[in-house]
UniProtKB/Swiss-Prot annotation:
Entry annotated with the keyword Nucleotide-binding: yes
Annotated EC: 2.7.1.6
Covalent S-S links between cysteines: none
This protein's name: Galactokinase
């Protein structure tokens, strides 16, 4: 959607002109899964599937929201003084949360807004539609009210909204990738320190294909919080002998030497994934920087195997996509991405083989699962921003 279309749609809905238009990307994580809340490293990119917005300030204290993705909900009106979570306010709880925490941080938001939203991230796909919306609202408010905000502060407010307003116990990777994304770069982020480097993404004759299971995944209803709790318990057991706060602080040798302290086989498996995935992510960064895409692909494959057997977050749909992708000509690697239990997988595919790849994987998936997957080419873009 371009800016003139955004402005036209805004005027259709609200009857006035928008002040500005905005875009906030989605994200995929190339590798480093379920490590962000374990103090480990991640390697995400911001993508051109994302969330568009148009907005204007109002003279009163009323917030009016409209989403083209939920047209049946119509315009949802919220008093600026009432930024509490309410089920009937549906998707607008995300913007309400961002506004609430901006105000709590001392930023002055002294009038209402009209906000039009359109997103082309499939809902429940695991490509971070909620984080994209959170950062979009942050950028809108920053522009309309001329707030002087560090981008990292907006990232943290997005995470705070997810954790403390919506109630999903997620890490910071999604908001960080979306807020800090850069053209044609992956972000190598240490989630323990929030130190990061931009890693140029030269895929040569290859593209990243996103494979959507089309099995909707509700993060707050999934086993995500259970996995996080298992890892936190493993850390507390390891602390009997080790001075650590997160699994991300461990190398494989130390983990192997002290894993006997973890009293449950499942928790050992969860912790082993977190430690090994952290090492794989470091190796993947080095492979990208050296242009060793075959090695990068092998690390993707190993990541999926670990997520299947040690972390147990894949399932029939994601496994079918990844396993079938591995068998195709021109594929360097494939893995699930995101929290799992549905959502999406990604594959690194030679660009000349993409159509054959989609046909073969789609056919096999439909035979096994009973309905078709969807495919998108991941184009890497910059972070959340003002368009005009």
């Amino acid at each position: 959607m371009n800016t003139s279309q955004l402005r036209e749609k805004f005027k259709e809905v609200f009857g006035v002109e928008a002040d500005h238009t905005f875009f906030s990307p989605g994200r995929i994580n190339l590798i480093g899964e379920h490590t962000d809340y374990n103090g480990g490293n991640v390697l995400p990119v911001a993508i051109t599937l994302g969330t568009y917005g148009a907005a204007r300030k109002r003279d009163d204290k009323v917030l009016r929201f409209f989403s083209a993705n939920f047209e049946e909900k119509g315009i949802i009106e919220v008093p600026l003084e009432n930024l509490r979570f309410e089920n009937e306010h549906n998707w607008t709880n995300y913007p309400k949360g961002v506004l609430h925490f901006l105000q709590e941080a001392g930023h002055t938001i002294d009038s209402g807004m009209d906000i039009y939203i359109y997103g082309n991230i499939p809902n429940g796909s695991g490509l971070s539609s909620s984080s994209s919306l959170e950062l979009l609202i942050g950028v809108i408010v920053e522009k309309l009210y001329d707030l002087k905000l560090e981008r990292l502060d907006l990232v943290k407010i997005g995470k705070q909204t997810e954790n403390d307003f919506i109630g999903v116990n997620s890490g910071i990777m999604d908001q960080f990738a979306i807020g800090m994304g850069a053209d044609q770069c992956a972000i190598y982020l240490d989630t323990n320190t929030l130190k990061y480097d931009l890693v140029p993404l030269d895929l040569k004759d290859n593209v990243v294909v996103i494979m959507n299971t089309n099995k909707r995944r509700e993060l707050s209803d999934s086993k995500y919080n259970e996995r996080r709790a298992e890892c936190e318990t493993a850390v507390s057991e390891l602390q009997e002998k080790l001075d650590i706060q997160t699994l991300g602080e461990l190398d494989l040798w130390t983990f192997d030497a002290y894993s006997y302290l973890i009293k449950d086989e499942n928790r050992i498996k969860r912790a082993r994934h977190a430690v090994l995935e952290n090492q794989r992510t470091l190796q993947a960064r080095k492979a990208l920087e050296a242009g060793e895409l075959e090695g990068f692909g092998r690390l993707m494959n190993a990541s999926h195997v670990s997520l299947k057997y040690d972390y147990e977050v894949t399932g029939l749909e994601l496994d079918t996509l990844a396993h079938t992708a591995w068998e195709q000509e021109g594929v360097l690697g494939a893995r699930m991405t995101g929290a799992g239990f549905g959502g999406c997988a990604i594959a690194l595919v030679n660009k000349d083989k993409v159509e054959d790849f989609k046909k073969a994987v789609g056919q096999r998936y439909e035979e096994v699962v009973g309905y078709a997957p969807s495919f998108y080419i991941a184009e890497v873009t910059g972070g959340s921003r003002v368009l005009d």
